[in-house]
Regions:
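Structural motif corresponding to alpha-helix initiation and N-cap regions
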Residues: 1, 18-22, 49, 84, ...
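Short, charged/polar "capping" segments at the starts of alpha-helices
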Residues: 1-5, 70-71
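Nucleotide-activated donor-binding/catalytic signature segment of Leloir-type glycosyltransferases, i.e.
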Residues: 3-28
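Nucleotide-sugar-dependent
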Residues: 22, 27, 36-56, 63-73
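An anion/phosphate-binding loop that grips the pyrophosphate of nucleotide cofactors and donors
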Residues: 31
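A charged, aromatic-enriched C-terminal amphipathic alpha-helix characteristic of glycosyltransferases
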Residues: 99-130
């Protein structure tokens, strides 16, 4: 991928590959912008990756490349680009954003997706119909 080659050459970008989950929060704390790099040939491209919710929980800017058929799930808190040129512009915007209003909103999305919150919601629904 020519874009990855370009990114590897930047002094402030580090492509480290998979890391143990226990280390992820430390890495996320060091990000200025969370980049969502997706492969276009993935069959599950319509599924929101777990990392998006992890990124949201940091409150930091997120830039993702959208596939042509993909719907923007969080247009108010994630920068979604449809071309490489737009991706570059979105990264610049993300670095320059004022986080005062959007960071808490991102964290709200992230906490709403927490497994404990989801489990509580399922329990509430099942209790409401007498199955729990």
């Amino acid at each position: 991928n020519p874009r990855l080659t370009y990114l590897r050459e930047l002094p402030n970008v580090h492509l480290l590959g998979p890391r143990p989950m226990v280390e992820v929060p430390d890495y996320l704390g060091r990000f200025d912008v969370c980049l969502d790099l997706q492969r276009r040939d993935r069959l599950d491209s319509d599924v929101i990756p777990r990392r998006i919710y992890e990124y949201l929980s940091t409150g930091k800017p997120i830039v993702t490349m959208l596939l042509p058929e993909q719907v923007e799930e969080f247009p108010d808190v994630i920068y979604g680009a449809h071309s490489l040129e737009e991706y570059d512009r979105m990264c610049e915007s993300a670095l320059a954003e004022d986080p005062t209003w959007v960071s808490p909103r991102r964290r709200d999305y992230g906490s709403a997706a927490a497994w404990s919150r989801r489990a509580s919601e399922i329990q509430r629904i099942l209790s409401g119909i007498g199955l729990y």
